[in-house]
Structure formats: structure tokens, C-alpha cells
């Protein structure tokens, strides 16, 4: 079976949240590895935030899901990949999810992520 999740976000929302809450916001949402990976900062962070939301949708996770349990990094070839920890990993195991494929994109104003889960 295939499961899909998509999310889109305005990049300015991530900028505004960082301006308002600073490092506390960033550390609550992103892992240290994700933060170090995002060179063009806000477009990349917004795409990774959208990825986390798409994974939450694909796995039907609760609203209070810890965002740092969903990590989006890059494979050596450059394509994005998802690592799951804690409750997110447990839910994927319950659903029999063996593989998550992810696509990220952004333009000047928006970032989008699409996740396909396969059992």
C-alpha cells in the first residue's frame, strides 16, 4: 500500500517565527543536523518544516508530535531522506511502513514537500 502526504508553507512564516522566538523555535522544530545543513536558511528550513508536516499527515500522527522525531537530511547523492525516531518511528512500524520517499522544493515565497510511504 502507498500513503501520501503533502504540505506547503509560506517561507515568511518560518522567518517570522524565528524572529519572534529565536533559537528556541529553531531547536524545538529542527535537529542540529538539519540546522547545519540549511545554508540558504529560510527556504531550506521552510521546506524541511513542510516535510515534517507531510510525514505527520502520512503517518496520521497526533498534533502534539515532536518535530525533532522527524528529521530530513540529504543522502550523499544530494536527494533528501527522512529519519524517524521515537513515536514517529513506532507509528511507521505499526503501519508496516518500510520506506519513505520525499521531494522538497521552494520558490521565493513558498516551500513544499511531498512524502510517499510504502509498506
UniProtKB/Swiss-Prot annotation:
Q: Which GO terms describe its cellular component?
A: cytoplasm
Specify the superkingdom.
Answer: Bacteria
First-listed, main subcellular location of the protein, grouped into a coarse class: cytoplasm
Q: Which reaction does it catalyse?
A: apo-[ACP] + CoA = holo-[ACP] + adenosine 3',5'-bisphosphate + H(+)
Kindly list the biological process annotations in GO that this record carries: fatty acid biosynthetic process
Alphabetized Gene3D superfamilies for the sequence: 4'-phosphopantetheinyl transferase domain
Key words, A-Z: Cytoplasm, Fatty acid biosynthesis, Fatty acid metabolism, Lipid biosynthesis, Lipid metabolism, Magnesium, Metal-binding, Transferase
Cofactor(s) required for function per UniProt? Mg(2+)
* Signal peptide location: none
Mind telling me which InterPro entries this protein's record contains?
4-PPantetheinyl_Trfase_dom (IPR008278), 4-PPantetheinyl_Trfase_dom_sf (IPR037143), ACPS (IPR002582), Ppantetheine-prot_Trfase_dom (IPR004568)
Pfam families named among the record's database cross-references: ACPS
- The entry marks the following residues as binding Mg(2+), namely 7, 53
The UniProt family comment states: Belongs to the P-Pant transferase superfamily. AcpS family.
List the NCBIfam families: acpS (TIGR00516), pantethn_trn (TIGR00556)
| Role of this protein | Transfers the 4'-phosphopantetheine moiety from coenzyme A to a Ser of acyl-carrier-protein.
Q: What is this protein called?
A: Holo-[acyl-carrier-protein] synthase
The top of its lineage is: Bacteria, Bacillati, Chloroflexota, Dehalococcoidia, Dehalococcoidales
